[in-house]
């Protein structure tokens, strides 16, 4: 019974870590997409990074 509890806790911890890494990855990808679109429309990279981190 104790082993099962430890296993479940470990499993849940791994799942939550994987989920947060995934969502952080999605946010980073969205930010770089934002910067790329912004630069393509003629702004400089610094402006775009600031603009994209605010949204």
UniProtKB/Swiss-Prot annotation:
Protein localization: Secreted
Annotated Gene Ontology cellular component terms = extracellular region
Q: Which cysteines are joined by disulfide bonds?
A: 34-48, 38-52
Signal sequence bounds? 1-20
Where is it expressed, tissue-wise?
Expressed by the venom duct.
Q: Which UniProt keywords apply?
A: Disulfide bond, Neurotoxin, Secreted, Signal, Toxin
Which GO molecular function annotations are given, in alphabetical order? toxin activity
Q: Does the keyword Disulfide bond apply?
A: yes
Principal location: secreted
Instruction: Summarize the protein's role.
Output: Probable neurotoxin.
- What is the UniProt domain comment for this protein? The cysteine framework is XIV (C-C-C-C).
Q: What is this protein called?
A: Conotoxin Cal14.14
Please name the taxonomic classification of the source: Eukaryota, Metazoa, Spiralia, Lophotrochozoa, Mollusca
